[in-house]
Amino acid sequence: MSLVNFSMTDIARQISRPTFFLLLSVFLACTQSLDLRRLETVSMLGAELYSDSGGDSLLTGIGTRLSAEPNNLSILMEKGSALEGLRRYKEAVEIYSQCLVISPESPEILRRRGQRYISLRKLDNAITDLELAARHHTFIKAENLKYTENLNWAIWYYLALTYYLQADFENALTAFQRSYDYSADNVSLLASVNWIHNCLRRLGRSDEARQVVEPIKENMGYSGNYYKCILVYNGTKTELETINYNTVKGFEMCTIGYGMANFHWVNGDKEIALKIFRKIVAEETWQANGFLAAEAELSRIQ
């Protein structure tokens, strides 16, 4: 009997009942897990991008509280965050749209929805929201503020990223420079420096790009993937010391990989850059900024 013609009954005859039912339960669990994944959007390259499965118990608890207070912005925003964590960005956008009916000029809600429009590859929508957020927000420089709490920085940073994805490097540079001005911790500072450098290199302003990254050195208390990129940009480290393309995965692959690929691209090594771009978009972390950037690069040369 050909293996491809095996039915569940055929398999059951070949193995013990306990083993059969164990295998069946595993198969059904896997199938249900796959069914819970939702199609979120289509990439700039035409690939289908899916949400994560699970999280129902958390959402059920939030839903119970919302049923008692359906217009409670705090609970609605909590639900939006939970949906983001599951990469259910379409539903998160719907929640933030509901929030904006209640508070239509909220810079924080506009920023959150704008950021998730980026994840959904709706870049024009993202720019509209993020420009509105900048218009309605009162920017006051803060000190020692974690990047996740720094709305000043986040508005400019994600607006800049959207321009960058559209290859509008002049506007991206201006917005990234503003994000740098409002950075209040090492993470936000290094992220802004990284992208300012990339914009300047794309604009052919190599001397300025070197000046931006030159002050960042080892043993300054910095860390993270953007820091690793910057040390390559300024010649402190080599690419070989920084990333192993055979082992690195996920966000690290997307962030450092894009930085290195872009560095190759502006230095004229475009075939190497393209190879890395393609490796990045083979990852599962399709929400990562580096993934988005690599995807945008490849979409422009198809």
Feature map (PLM): residue ranges:
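Flexible helix-coil transition and linker loops at the boundaries of alpha-helical arrays
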Residues: G63-P70, R135-E149, D181-N186, Y245-N246
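N-terminal leader/linker segments that initiate helical-solenoid repeat arrays
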Residues: C30-E78, G85-L86, Q302
